[in-house]
């Protein structure tokens, strides 16, 4: 009986060739190994730990709960390389009642080489919070999410780079980011929505049409969020949802165009109207920003009648000088969209208007004498 009790209360032990957890050194995985199990257990990669999955190596992470992490990475995981295959699979074979911890978590870095793949499959906890959190992820290979059922939870990546050879397909799983930088060179991103939390986020679009398979970018918080978008080629955003107290900054390279098909507020407990919202354009030039036809310019601001919301428009030139003028829309028949246009008074016309005003003021002063 005593031996049975001891067996019941023994902690889960990983039967694998990996060094004991936490990993605090470099380890090359070239065979087929596994961590985790369906009832619990955590494998940790410490800040000084480096796990290399090369030479056809496969690591399978199995879990059956998310009350705590199954894999925690605060170091570096390298999956595959340009000339060497590597695979990391995260799988839950059965459903379970969700907890509140990320299955894979940590502030470390995951690098997926050209012949590398990271796959999440099976049951993924479905709840309105983060079930995967990777601090830094660089993708030259493939990242795929293939859930066995619908998913409401988020795949959070704070700092992301997707190379020309890379692809990030999250399937039906929402993406999430906070206080980081996303550099997208190619391959693109496929997801229902990118949810942006409070703080500041930068998105660099370094190729054409990189977000055409991302259905929406949504600013979740109304406590103050800044999203910076640096656009280096023609790109389309299907839906851009913003909240109150949001600032959206655009820097669009000369000759490039950014199209936003739908520019709307986020549903905030059935309150759609948003206040204190600003769109800021740096190195602004006409012919660079286009949106749909359900918008007006009113009081020199962008007005969205469907949600009775005003967006302050601010523009700067290439030297950082504030551009003052009149905003308007011009219909672009080729794109079937509105082009946002800023008409800035010519210096000569401005000087003449200033001179006329000064003369009128002087004559008015004489008439009073």
Residue ranges, per PLM feature:
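Sec-dependent, cleavable N-terminal signal peptides
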Residues: 1-19, 351, 358-359, 369
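The right-handed parallel beta-helix/beta-solenoid scaffold, focusing on the short coil/turn
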Residues: 25, 41, 47-49, 57, ...
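A short, hydrophobic C-terminal helix/tail in secreted or cell-surface proteins
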Residues: 346-364
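Right-handed parallel beta-helix/beta-spiral solenoid domain characteristic of secreted/periplasmic
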Residues: 62-63, 83-92, 119
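Flexible "stalk/tail and boundary" regions
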Residues: 21-24, 31-39, 55, 71, ...
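Extracellular/surface-exposed low-complexity segments
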Residues: 9, 14-37, 41, 205, ...
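Extended, solvent-exposed polar beta/coil surface segments
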Residues: 53-54, 61-62, 68, 80
């Amino acid at each position: 009986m005593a031996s049975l009790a001891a067996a019941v209360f023994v902690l889960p032990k990983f039967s694998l060739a990996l060094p004991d957890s936490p990993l605090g050194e470099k380890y090359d995985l070239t065979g087929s190994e596994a961590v985790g199990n369906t009832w619990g257990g955590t494998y940790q990669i410490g800040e000084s730990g480096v796990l290399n999955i090369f030479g056809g190596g496969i690591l399978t992470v199995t879990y059956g709960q998310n009350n705590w992490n199954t894999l925690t990475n605060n170091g570096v995981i390298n999956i595959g390389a340009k000339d060497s295959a590597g695979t990391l699979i995260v799988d839950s074979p059965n459903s379970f009642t969700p907890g509140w911890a990320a299955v894979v978590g940590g502030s470390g870095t995951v690098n997926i080489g050209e012949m590398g793949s990271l796959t999440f499959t099976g049951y993924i906890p479905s709840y309105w919070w983060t079930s995967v959190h990777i601090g830094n992820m660089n993708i030259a290979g493939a990242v795929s999410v293939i859930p066995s059922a619908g998913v409401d939870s988020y795949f959070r990546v704070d700092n992301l780079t997707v190379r020309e050879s890379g692809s990030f397909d999250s399937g039906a799983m929402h993406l999430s980011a906070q206080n980081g930088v996303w550099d997208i060179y190619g391959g693109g991103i496929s997801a229902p929505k990118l949810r942006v939390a409070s703080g500041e986020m930068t998105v660099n679009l370094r190729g054409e049409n990189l977000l055409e398979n991302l259905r929406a970018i949504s600013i979740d918080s109304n406590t103050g969020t800044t999203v910076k978008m640096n656009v280096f080629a023609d790109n389309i955003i299907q839906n851009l949802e913003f909240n109150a107290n949001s600032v959206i900054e655009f820097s669009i390279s000369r000759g490039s165009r950014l199209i936003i098909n739908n520019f709307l507020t986020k549903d905030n407990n059935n309150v759609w109207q948003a206040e204190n919202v600003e769109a800021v354009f740096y190195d602004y030039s006409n012919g660079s920003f286009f949106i749909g036809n359900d918008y007006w310019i009113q009081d020199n601001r962008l007005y969205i009648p469907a949600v009775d919301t005003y967006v302050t428009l601010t523009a700067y030139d290439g030297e950082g000088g504030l551009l003052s003028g009149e905003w308007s829309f011009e219909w672009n028949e080729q794109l079937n969209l509105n082009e946002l246009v800023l008409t800035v008074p010519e210096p000569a016309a401005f000087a003449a208007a200033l001179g006329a005003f000064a003369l009128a003021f002087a004559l008015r002063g004489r008439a009073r004498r």
